[in-house]
């Protein structure tokens, strides 16, 4: 099993400029799921995707002329592995001096390599120069929790802050915060994010939810793991009937990661880059 501490994170790296699929460093999802009470071999109470956007994709055409594109990778949450982000960056950089016959050929190669590394089927979408002007931006929709004037003194995940009034009638709400910050599991570097929580169930105390989200501020965990921890904590403490958690993290190393987890059938969220991304 590939362990995070064996990844390229936090280590000097030689930047290869010719294609090398072995640069991808998969990390098993299960150990961190075990930490949040999801044992191996049993179904998890959510499904979803990890949406990666790459802004620094370049290769050479067959005449040696550089090409550029944006890329989106959709990795199902039921794949056994995630990809460590620095290794993903190094892998993408390995195309910089590699001749590729067409964008379609690159897309097929990316699909093959990433599907093999994650152990599932990864969707790949390329946006070439001709379509760059069509890209849109947008913010997460929902009631902004950050409007609340609260006092905060806890900066490690504190699920006991989560409360829901089970005596009240169920509500359907979408709540948003831009105050999510966690830190890389290996390097401790800050990861900044916005998070949207959609639920149906007993009303969740908004001050407690905001304090809980802020409590990740000194926590070291990868993006995908933080979102799954949030999902499980809200489910256990607030017991909603339906729950969806979507986080959009700011870019690092030319990549942003946007995990989505839900326990009900709903379309995957729009992949709209927000102002901080």
From Swiss-Prot:
An example molecular function term from Gene Ontology annotations: preQ1 synthase activity
Pathway in which this enzyme or protein is active: tRNA modification; tRNA-queuosine biosynthesis
Keywords: Cytoplasm, NADP, Oxidoreductase, Queuosine biosynthesis
Residues that bind NADPH: 85-86, 252-253
Keyword Mitochondrion: no
Assembly and interaction partners: Homodimer.
Official protein name in the record: NADPH-dependent 7-cyano-7-deazaguanine reductase
Gene name tied to this protein: queF
